Amino acid sequence: ENAEIQCIPTFIAPKTTHIKGKSLVLDLGGTNYRVAIVDFDKATPTVHPNNGWKKDMSIMKSVGYTREELFKELADMIIGIKREEEMPIGYCFSYPAESVPGGDAKLLRWTKGVDIKEMVGEFIGKPLLDYLNERNKIKFTGIKVVNDTIASLFAGLTDNSYDAYIGLIVGTGTNMATFIPADKIEKLDQSCNAHGLIPVNLESGNFHPPFLTAVDDTVDAISGNPGKQRFEKAVSGMYL
């Protein structure tokens, strides 16, 4: 749990065939928030509108920012979307979170300058789902939460010509994910009944490289979380 590289399993099996239906997709990153509806009724997924809706979420980094304020910001864009049917939500959440069977996740800590303390240790998906369903006449049927690296990892599976995959993010922050055989992950709870390849969020931004310089030490010292995310602070957009 306190390891430098946490290797957080995700209990959502990827699918590359027989996918059908529509889903609302949310992407909350270190800087931007994006919303779109994805239609899987054809061989190639269709995004409506073409590039989705986008909003700058730098306000999340404000001192004293609350969960209620965050949920309202997220909901305001969703309420404006015209839907004629119920659908599930896929939530790409770009912060360290512990995935649980069923598709939700618990926030472990904030990174990238965000610090909404009341959300740490709490579920990410279900409270947002309840909040949205209280404010939408046409309900959402469920929610699945994945890290942005896991989403990138799954996207790579659309090209099946490779024998190994890595989901890499280098943006406001940095992180990566990959597939690891379930029998090699000793910390997996036996009740999960996991088998085959498991998508794992490495949380590699917390790696502490041995080659950092005095400049890196200065950046770390004046950051909001000294001693943590040292690799991220050395290479990602927020700190560069």
Describe the function of each predicted region.
Residues 52-72, 97-159, 164-166, 184-206, ...:
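Glycine-rich phosphate-binding loop and adjoining helix at the ATP-binding site
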Residues 11-48, 80, 99, 165-182:
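Gly/Thr-rich phosphate-binding beta-strand-loop-beta motif of the actin/hexokinase/Hsp70
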Residues 23-24, 85-94, 143-144:
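Short glycine-rich phosphate-binding loop at a beta-alpha junction
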Residues 11-15, 153, 158-170, 174-240:
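Active-site core segments that coordinate phosphate-bearing ligands/cofactors
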Residues 1-12, 47-48, 54-55, 107-109:
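Charge-rich, low-complexity intrinsically disordered linkers/tails
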Residues 74-88, 132-137:
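Phosphate/pyrophosphate-binding loops at sites that engage ATP/ADP/AMP, CoA/4′-phosphopantetheine
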Residues 1-17, 143-147, 151:
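Charged, flexible boundary elements
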